[in-house]
Amino acid sequence: DLVMMPLETADITRLEAEGWNAPEVFVAKGRDGKTDMWGLIARPTNFDPNKKYPVIEYIYQGPGDQYVPKTFRPYDWNMTSLAELGFIVVMVDGMGTSFRSRAFENVCYKNLKDAGLPDHIAWMKAAARKYPYMDVDRVGIYGCSAGGQESTNAVLLYPDFYKAAYSACGCHDNRMDKIWWNELWLGYPVGDQYKEGSNVENAHLLSRPLMLVVGELDDNVDPASTMQVVNALIKANKDFELVVIPGAHHTMGEAFGEHKRYDFFVRHLMQVNPPKWDEIK
């Protein structure tokens, strides 16, 4: 006979006593109007459904796995902290992620440019129809590593939807990143599929606020990947922000980057000038 019994139970009463609420699991159809896309919606603890909230997406589309948390996490890349500033913060797995079906994952093959973004956009628009307090006319996006590439990609290729991006340690051009990883998803020989998804090649398209962040000693993605985008943006006469973290490795930006990210989205999505950090007690 099969016997099932709980081995342990998490006690979250102290979190709940502080006003913490778990993110909502939300499902909506993707780009094809048929396939379910699953994600999370995080709200501030002082949430008021009568207000309008800018939306920020945390992206890590990979590929190679599912990335939206399936287990209890009180803290995921500071989604909840960002929400406390007065944002709705979301994360969704789009087509190209793993463990759904071969066809679902193969959307990304020789097509990392896609980044699941058409599904993410459809999902957020569906969420906003159900929850009108989600203002999808003010959407920002942030990510690190592949997410850094994808968040920059979002404002370059979908500027009508994504209005600002914070991109950390991005592998912005797959022709210069780890060969084994890139050939796994983009194939060999190197062809147009590499060029089409390159933020270096597409840098001239920038029309939205962008903050690029890089760790000086990144030993996962060469910092030159970010600097190539910087060079292309300068040549294209584009305005942007660059933050280099001395001594940092592959990072979302460490404590200094957290400050910069919070301020960046407050400025560009709320149109508010945040206080100086060194004056906050």
Task: Provide a role label for each language-model segment.
Residues 1-281:
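Serine-hydrolase catalytic core recognition
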